[in-house]
Design a protein with these regions (language model features):
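Beta-rich accessory regions
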Residues: 53-58, 118-163
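A residue-level signal for beta-strand positions that form part of recognition/binding surfaces
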Residues: 93, 111, 140
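Active-site core of glycosidic bond-cleaving carbohydrate-active enzymes
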Residues: 2-108, 118, 151
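Domain-scale activation on soluble regions of proteins
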Residues: 113-115
């Protein structure tokens, strides 16, 4: 018999995004070992990518399924298990900040990019030289550096330069 028992990350009525599917058929006779598993880190990466591409609701649907699995009733909401406790791949959820706000910083050009998919927002930002919050409110960017320095010469908001 099978002596190797893999962990189960979703079961029963749990929703989740499978690592691999064959919607048009053609499943291999020996598919790769993890193909039918659900990993939050992959789900968050796919969700943030969908958000970046403008498919915000599809991305949020994936996140809702993750959070329902880890809502504290059955699973620890602070320990999204993958390959052991406190596995780092779930930190891909950080990508949703960029996916929803479109915020990214170019330290060479000293440009802060904003391309919000959610309207006004206030979000955490971290660079190699500092961290704080970035806000888009009433058509204006506001950077509040809490520690260090984030040298911004211009803002690029949805493709338009704002000095």
């Amino acid at each position: 018999g099978d002596v190797y028992k893999r962990q189960v990350y979703a079961c029963g009525k749990d929703g989740g995004l499978l690592l691999c599917t064959w919607p048009k058929g053609g499943m291999l006779s020996l598919p790769f070992v993890y193909s039918n598993e659900v990993w939050t880190g992959i789900e968050y990466q796919v969700a943030s990518h969908l958000m970046m591409k403008g498919e915000v609701e599809k991305g949020l649907d994936i996140v809702r399924e993750c959070r329902e699995r880890y809502d504290g009733r059955v699973r620890n909401p602070f320990n999204e298990i993958e390959c052991g406790h406190w596995y780092a791949r779930a930190m891909a959820s950080y990508g949703m900040l960029q996916g929803l706000t479109g915020v990214r910083y170019d330290a060479v050009d000293k440009t802060m990019y904003i391309n919000s998919k959610i309207g006004d927002f206030k979000s955490f930002i971290s660079t190699d030289t500092g961290f704080g919050t970035i806000e888009w409110k009433a058509g204006k960017p506001v950077l509040n550096v809490v520690y260090g320095n984030i040298d911004v010469k211009r803002y690029n908001v949805s493709g338009k330069i704002v000095d």
